[in-house]
Each structure stands twice: as structure tokens, then as C-alpha cells.
């Protein structure tokens, strides 16, 4: 009788304790990992929503404290003080992570640029980087070369990300498309709780934009597009959902900027503009987003630069909600244009306005069914967890 292989003990290191897209991917993997021979401990730099959600899912969590100054550094910060803060922060966080690793840990599975570098400073473990982002353009080939030198394996969330990181003969990331929990994210009857919370007439149609409040997520472009389209969509309201959950220096003040922009939104000519702020609404970050999507008629996802994957796009499709998405990056691999949604040229508010008008006039019933079928065909959280676990076991065996 063959023996059941012992589970592989893995430390899943995340630079963020918030609950954005990549953190939800980690949460869904960790909650399923034991089914596929992985014993995970998620290591975070501080307590937060992710730690709470992991605890609810029964996943072990360890806090390896990192300084707030280090965590606030973003890809756009630069200069000698920032470099020193980064080096010191990485050194200290690597020590803290090492102190929290459970006995028997074999693999460091990192999520986020700072997590990748911190894990590289901990000798004696196999390392696998999960690439949720494109390498920063201004650094040229540095990050892909670092990945080739400092990791034993890399996972990319999309073909677009894999292509951006690939270095001939040195680095070929394995593509594992993200998934979602198809039991949570599923079509449901509308309850009108969003309409009621925002005091919007139940007869109104809603375009939803769930996204972290960050400049590159494109909320300002979506507001401009809605201004252009609003006169032809008199019964449509725009709902911007989210919050400033990542406290990096580059994004401070953006939420206030967005609120000011919406307060100035108007439709009509320059001579006689009519305020639109009664048709553009804010809804705070929703920790249970599967309750949110069924309340929308359409979801818009319009980042200003290519999205590495686009989890919001997938969540909406899984709930049977058609999507308007920028025609770049990961959404190209998720949305079947004309079947489960529409792909729109990026950074073009006029094109997005036209797409809003066309979508609002379309029969959405066939797209709703196609959206759900698309999610079911390739994007389950179980499939994702199984593929990631297989790679972790391979790396742990020394074959990665």
C-alpha cells in the first residue's frame, strides 16, 4: 500500500495585508492549498483585512513586522533617502520573516516586489515568485534578470505578464491564470441594496466601477467618459466602488482628487452645463464583492496602463455581468469581445463613452449567459490552486 506524501510546508509571503485583487488570489489559494498537498503559512508585514480573512478560512498567519516607511515606498519613489529606506527595510523585514518561518518550511512563495526581494535575503529555502505585475518600464531588464537570478521558479498571472518578464534562455515564467470561487461569484437575483443605499430609483440602470483608488485604475477617465455619454443615457447612474487601501506615497491624495472631480462633473455644453454629481456615486470598499456585482447592469474596468490580469473583470463575468474593459493586458485573455463584454481602446474617454452608449442599448441577456460560461471554462479557483500547488511541490523537490 503506497504512503500518502507528507504535505509540503510553504511560507506564502505578501507585502500587503489589505484585500485587493492579488491578495484575494492568495487568500483563495491558501484556503484550498491543503487539498493539493500544501501546508501554507501566510506571512504578512502587519495585521489587516487579509489576516482576518485568512483566519476565517482556517489558514495559519504569521506577522513579520515591517516599518511603515518601508511599506509606503512605491515604484515611483526615488532618491538617496528612499533607496536607504528600501535597503534598510528589506534587511529588517527579511530578518522578521525568517524569525516567523515554521519549522520544516521548504519553500518561500512571494507575492509583490518587496516580498520577492526580502525572500531573496533569506538563505536556505527554495523560492518561487508569483508575478502579479509587469516589471517597471523605467528599470529596463533589471527586474527580469533579478527574477532569473533570485528565484527557482516564477508564475505569471497572464500571458501578457509572462511575455513582459521573459528573458531568452534565462527566465520563462509559467502562466497560471487567476481564478475565482465560482460558488461565491455566481449570478444572483438583484436585491436593489445598492440602489437603496445610494437613494437611486430602482428603475435606474447602474454601471459599476469597482477598483482600488489609484491613479492608474482610471476612475478619472471613466468619469470623463460618463460625462460625454450621460445625455444619451438619462436613466443610467455610475457607481464608483472602492477606497484607498494601499497607503503608498504615490497614491496619497488621489481619493480627494477623485471626489473633487466628481463634484465638478456635468453634462451639456460649456454655456449651460448641468451638474452630474447626482448620477455619479461613491460606494465604499466592499469586503464581500460577490454581493455587489449582481446589482449592476454593466461593469467598467478601464486602467490607464495595461492590467496584468484584471480580477474585477473575472469576478463580474462569473456573476454574469458583461464588462467594458480596456483593450490591453490581461483583459484580452478574459473577455470574449462581443460575447461576454466589450474591449475599448485604452486612454480614450470618447471611445469609452461610445461603448457605454452601445452597451446600454444592447440586449444584455445573451452576454450574461456567455459571461458566466466564460468564467466557468478557464477561471475556477480550484483549478488555479491545483496548478500553483503542483509548481510549489515541484520546486520543493528541487526540480523547479
Label each region the model flagged:
Residues 186-200, 368, 372:
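A short helix/loop element that forms part of the nucleotide-sugar donor recognition site in Leloir-type
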Residues 160, 179:
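Carbohydrate-associated surface elements
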Residues 252-284:
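Nucleotide-activated donor-binding/catalytic signature segment of Leloir-type glycosyltransferases, i.e.
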Residues 11, 201-217, 223-226, 239:
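Conserved donor-binding/catalytic core segment of Leloir-type glycosyltransferases
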Residues 93, 109-116, 131:
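Short His-centered aromatic/hydrophobic patch
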Residues 294-308, 321:
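Acidic donor-binding loop of glycosyltransferase active sites
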Residues 327, 336-338, 342-349, 357-362:
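Conserved acidic donor-binding segment of nucleotide-sugar-dependent glycosyltransferases
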Residues 313, 322-325:
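Short hydrophobic beta-strand element within catalytic cores of glycosyltransferases
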Amino acid at each position: 500500500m503506497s504512503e500518502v506524501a507528507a504535505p509540503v510546508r510553504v511560507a506564502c509571503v505578501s507585502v500587503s495585508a489589505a484585500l485587493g485583487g492579488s491578495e484575494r488570489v492568495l487568500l483563495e489559494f491558501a484556503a484550498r492549498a491543503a487539498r493539493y498537498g500544501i501546508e501554507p503559512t501566510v506571512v504578512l508585514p502587519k495585521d489587516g483585512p487579509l489576516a482576518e480573512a485568512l483566519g476565517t478560512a482556517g489558514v495559519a498567519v504569521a506577522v513579520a513586522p515591517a516599518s511603515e516607511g518601508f511599506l509606503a515606498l512605491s515604484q515611483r519613489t526615488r532618491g538617496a533617502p528612499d533607496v536607504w529606506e528600501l535597503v534598510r527595510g528589506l534587511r529588517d523585514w527579511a530578518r522578521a520573516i525568517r524569525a516567523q518561518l515554521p519549522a520544516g518550511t521548504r519553500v518561500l512563495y512571494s507575492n509583490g516586489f518587496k516580498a520577492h526581494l526580502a525572500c531573496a535575503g533569506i538563505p536556505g529555502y527554495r523560492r518561487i515568485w508569483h508575478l502579479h505585475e509587469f516589471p517597471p518600464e523605467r528599470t529596463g531588464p533589471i527586474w527580469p534578470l533579478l527574477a532569473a537570478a533570485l528565484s527557482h521558479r516564477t508564475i505569471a498571472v497572464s500571458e501578457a505578464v509572462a511575455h513582459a518578464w521573459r528573458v531568452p534562455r534565462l527566465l520563462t515564467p509559467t502562466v497560471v491564470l487567476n481564478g475565482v470561487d465560482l460558488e461565491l461569484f455566481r449570478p444572483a437575483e438583484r436585491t436593489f441594496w445598492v440602489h437603496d443605499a445610494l437613494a437611486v430609483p430602482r428603475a435606474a440602470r447602474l454601471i459599476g466601477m469597482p477598483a482600488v483608488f489609484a491613479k492608474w485604475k482610471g476612475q478619472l477617465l471613466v468619469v470623463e467618459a460618463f460625462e460625454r455619454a450621460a445625455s444619451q443615457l438619462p436613466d443610467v447612474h455610475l457607481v464608483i466602488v472602492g477606497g484607498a487601501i494601499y497607503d503608498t506615497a504615490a497614491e496619497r491624495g488621489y481619493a480627494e482628487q477623485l471626489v473633487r472631480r466628481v463634484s465638478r462633473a456635468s453634462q451639456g455644453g460649456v454655456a449651460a452645463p448641468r451638474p452630474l454629481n447626482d448620477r455619479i456615486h461613491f460606494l465604499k470598499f466592499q469586503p464581500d464583492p460577490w454581493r455587489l456585482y449582481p446589482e449592476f447592469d454593466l461593469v467598467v474596468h478601464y486602467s490607464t496602463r495595461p492590467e496584468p490580469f484584471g480580477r474585477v473583470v473575472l469576478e463580474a463575468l462569473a456573476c454574469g455581468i458583461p464588462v467594458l474593459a480596456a483593450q490591453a493586458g490581461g483583459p484580452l485573455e478574459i473577455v470574449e469581445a462581443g460575447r461576454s463584454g466589450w474591449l475599448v481602446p485604452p486612454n480614450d474617454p470618447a471611445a469609452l463613452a461610445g461603448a457605454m452608449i452601445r452597451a446600454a442599448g444592447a440586449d444584455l441577456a445573451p452576454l450574461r449567459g456567455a459571461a458566466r460560461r466564460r468564467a466557468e471554462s478557464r477561471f475556477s479557483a480550484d483549478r488555479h490552486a491545483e496548478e500553483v500547488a503542483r509548481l510549489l511541490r515541484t520546486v520543493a523537490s528541487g526540480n523547479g
